[in-house]
């Protein structure tokens, strides 16, 4: 059987990335140019700046990915690209490059949903992983529990009703003066604190709902900080981070395990930037032990936005004959399962 090479392109937020993946699982290259340092002074991603940087970097990043893979552009079988959700200006840069290449080379174009890409990162890390399983996709923009019935069949079982988990990490990090991005900094700082020092709320909705809500938790953290400052008392940043992180992780892991029970599956997975959190990984493994659940998660570099996951997802779309035409447009609010 002939090897299938997919060129993946990802520009949905502040990473410019291109990757070549063979047969959906073997990464030949995965070039990622991050803009984190560029946006740090603003405390978050500035869409216009992100788009302009993508324009500057997209072709050099694509060329580098082909060079590292040791192939010529003509050798790729198809081009996969994120077309939503994300920042519309950022999405358009990657999409324009992918469409131009596909048209010029007469190669199939495959539009990939960003969240499907994050889920697919697990296939790269775990060569034997196959659906069905339930997956928690948690990042700065998303908090979803997804039932992965097949490589191209997804059901959202739960989602955030307000702030995404990663967004809450960013806001709390800013509140305690740790800067942006909040996830890695809080993870590191929390290791020095006591997770039981402050009893922050855990929101669980009734009626078997697996939805999340982190705005109340975020407000509780801000109220605690303001209260301590008004009383002229010092508070431990380490304890705040540890207690906040523990509250988030408790809810995420509880809901994911509940989803596995509801669907009767024995495999649970993590995906997205928050999936790199060390407590989330260890806590899920610990809770899954006595339940006969297998736990899967990608290496940290595959948790953040990257094109390898997009190429992987595109591969399974390609096998099913799902391709896009040159009229494919960026859809910033694209819902999972829409085509």
UniProtKB/Swiss-Prot annotation:
Q: Which GO terms describe its molecular function?
A: iron ion binding; N(6)-L-threonylcarbamoyladenine synthase activity
Checking InterPro entries in the record gives: ATPase_NBD, Gcp-like_dom, KAE1/TsaD, Peptidase_M22_CS, TsaD
Give the signal peptide range: none
Query: GO biological process annotations for this chain's record?
Result: tRNA threonylcarbamoyladenosine modification
Q: Name one Pfam family in it.
A: TsaD
Instruction: Give the EC number.
Output: 2.3.1.234
Q: Which reaction does it catalyse?
A: L-threonylcarbamoyladenylate + adenosine(37) in tRNA = N(6)-L-threonylcarbamoyladenosine(37) in tRNA + AMP + H(+)
Q: Which cofactor does it need?
A: Fe(2+)
Chain sites annotated for binding Fe cation? 114, 118, 305
Where in the cell?
Cytoplasm
Cofactor note text: Binds 1 Fe(2+) ion per subunit.
Output the Gene Ontology cellular-component terms: cytoplasm
Binding residues for substrate: 137-141, 170, 183, 187, 277
Q: Which family does it belong to?
A: Belongs to the KAE1 / TsaD family.
Write down the PANTHER family for this protein, in alphabetical order.
TRNA N6-ADENOSINE THREONYLCARBAMOYLTRANSFERASE (PTHR11735), TRNA N6-ADENOSINE THREONYLCARBAMOYLTRANSFERASE, MITOCHONDRIAL (PTHR11735:SF6)
Q: What does this protein do?
A: Required for the formation of a threonylcarbamoyl group on adenosine at position 37 (t(6)A37) in tRNAs that read codons beginning with adenine. Is involved in the transfer of the threonylcarbamoyl moiety of threonylcarbamoyl-AMP (TC-AMP) to the N6 group of A37, together with TsaE and TsaB. TsaD likely plays a direct catalytic role in this reaction.
Write the protein's name. Answer: tRNA N6-adenosine threonylcarbamoyltransferase
What is this protein's gene name? tsaD
């Amino acid at each position: 059987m002939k090897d299938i090479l997919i060129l993946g392109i990802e520009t949905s937020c502040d990473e410019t990335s291109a990757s070549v993946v063979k047969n959906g699982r073997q990464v030949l290259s995965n070039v990622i140019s991050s803009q984190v340092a560029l946006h740090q002074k603003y405390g978050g991603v500035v869409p216009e700046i992100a788009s302009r940087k993508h324009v500057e970097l997209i072709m050099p990043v694509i060329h580098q990915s082909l060079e590292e893979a040791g192939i010529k552009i003509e050798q790729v079988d198809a081009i996969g690209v994120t077309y939503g959700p994300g920042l519309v200006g950022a999405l358009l840069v990657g999409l324009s490059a992918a469409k131009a290449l596909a048209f010029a080379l007469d190669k199939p174009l495959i539009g990939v949903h960003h969240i499907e890409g994050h889920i697919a990162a697990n296939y790269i890390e775990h060569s034997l992983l196959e659906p069905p399983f339930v997956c928690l996709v948690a990042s700065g923009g998303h908090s979803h529990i997804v039932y992965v019935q097949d490589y191209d069949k997804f059901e959202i079982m739960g989602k955030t009703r307000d702030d995404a988990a990663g967004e809450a990490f960013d806001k709390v990090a800013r509140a305690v003066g740790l800067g942006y991005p909040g996830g890695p900094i809080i993870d590191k700082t929390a290791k020095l604190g006591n997770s039981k020092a402050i009893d922050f709320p855990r929101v669980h909705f009734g009626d078997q709902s697996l939805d999340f809500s982190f705005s109340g938790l975020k407000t509780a953290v801000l109220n605690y900080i303001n209260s301590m400052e008004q009383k002229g008392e010092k508070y431990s940043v380490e304890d705040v981070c540890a207690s906040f992180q523990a509250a988030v992780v408790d809810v995420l892991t509880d809901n994911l395990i509940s989803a596995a029970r509801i669907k009767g599956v024995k495999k649970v997975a993590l995906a997205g930037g928050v999936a790199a959190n060390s407590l989330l990984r260890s806590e899920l493994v610990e809770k899954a032990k006595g339940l006969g659940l297998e736990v899967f998660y990608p290496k940290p570099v595959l948790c953040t936005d990257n094109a390898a996951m997009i190429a992987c997802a595109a591969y399974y779309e390609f096998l099913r004959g799902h391709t896009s035409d040159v009229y494919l447009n960026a859809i910033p609010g694209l819902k999972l399962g829409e085509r």
